[in-house]
Structures are given as C-alpha cells and as structure tokens.
Regions:
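Cytoplasmic-side transmembrane-helix entry/capping segments in multi-pass membrane proteins
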Residues: 33, 90-92
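Juxtamembrane transmembrane-helix termini in multi-pass membrane transport proteins
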Residues: 1-60, 115-134
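Selective transmembrane alpha-helices of multi-pass membrane proteins
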Residues: 55-85, 139-149, 157-166
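Short helix-coil transition sites and intra-membrane helix breaks within transmembrane domains
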Residues: 4-8, 105-106, 146
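Alpha-helical membrane-protein architecture signal
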Residues: 93-101, 129-133
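Alpha-helical transmembrane segments and their lipid-water interface positions
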Residues: 11, 37-49, 70-73, 110, ...
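Selected transmembrane alpha-helices and immediately adjacent juxtamembrane segments
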Residues: 103-113
Length: 166
C-alpha cells in the first residue's frame, strides 16, 4: 500500500508541482477532486473485480498487467532526465474538476487499485463491504500522502526562493 501511494505518480507529481507554484492552499480544491475521483475509480474497479471469476484467464491477465505496469512505470520515472521535471512558473491553477479528471487518465491508479482489489477484496469480506473498506483505507492513506506532497512542494519552493537559504 505504501509503495503504491507514496511513490511518485501523476497525483503526487501534480500535488507537489502545483503547490510549489501556487502555494499549499491552492491544492485544497484539487485534493478534494482527487479524492472524489479516487473513490469513484475504486468503486468502478471493485465492482468489476467482484464480478470476475478468480480462476479466469482475464483475472490473471489483470493481475499481471497491473504488476508489470507498476514495474514499467517505476523504470520510466527513474530514467527521466531531471530537466524534464523542472517547474514551469506558467502552470495554471487546477481545481476539483482537474482532480477528478486526473483519476480517470491516471494509469498508475487504475493498476494500483486493480491489484489491491484483486489481492485483498475477498479478505475484506468481498462485495460492497469489502470494496468500501478497501476504498476507505487507500483513500485515507492517499489523501494523507497528497497532503504531505503538497506541503513538501510548498516548503521546497519557499526554501529555494529564500535569499539566505536558497
């Protein structure tokens, strides 16, 4: 859970870069949208996983696809040149709509939630109860992670802009 939530991905990078440019308070609306989208993606994937037979080839494909996606994403992120990660001062402010939309195009999230639901849904009781339990745990941890990344981005830029420290 911690690896999926605290490693860099679209949500974390958006939270840190947006707060670095616009300040930590600017992320409140964005984070609310991220949570709404995150919960929606969990409910969609949980409902699909609940309906798929665990012994099916499709279920195995989803499981392995999610794992391979994480590995590939990690390799790609580690190989990115640092120049590509520079902060552009012209970044527009984002709001809850962007936070929601990001969840539907965030491949890391879809893979992460798929793997979590496939591996743990039955252990959490299955059905809507299991889906809601997993959703509440991962959403809480994800929100805490986004808050941490938000304050990190804000503090980092404040330090770099300071005449004495930066």
């Amino acid at each position: 859970l911690a690896v999926g939530i605290f490693t860099p991905g679209p949500n974390n990078i958006t939270a840190i870069s947006h707060s670095a440019v616009h300040g930590a308070r600017s992320n409140i609306s964005l984070l609310i949208g991220m949570v709404i989208g995150f919960v929606t993606v969990h409910l969609i994937i949980g409902s699909v996983v609940e309906q798929i037979d665990e012994e099916s080839v499709f279920f195995s494909f989803l499981e392995w696809f999610g794992i391979l996606f994480f590995v590939a994403l990690g390799i790609i992120i580690l190989r990115l040149p640092i120049e590509r990660l520079s902060v552009d001062q012209d970044i527009k402010r984002l709001d809850f709509r962007h936070g929601i939309a990001l969840q539907f195009i965030n491949g890391k999230e879809w893979a992460f939630v798929s793997v979590i639901m496939i591996q743990f849904l039955d252990g959490f009781g299955g059905g809507i109860t299991g889906i809601l339990l997993i959703t509440s745990i991962t959403t809480t941890a994800g929100l805490l992670s986004m808050i941490l990344w938000t304050f990190t981005g804000h503090k980092l830029m404040a330090t770099l802009r300071d005449e004495r420290k930066g």
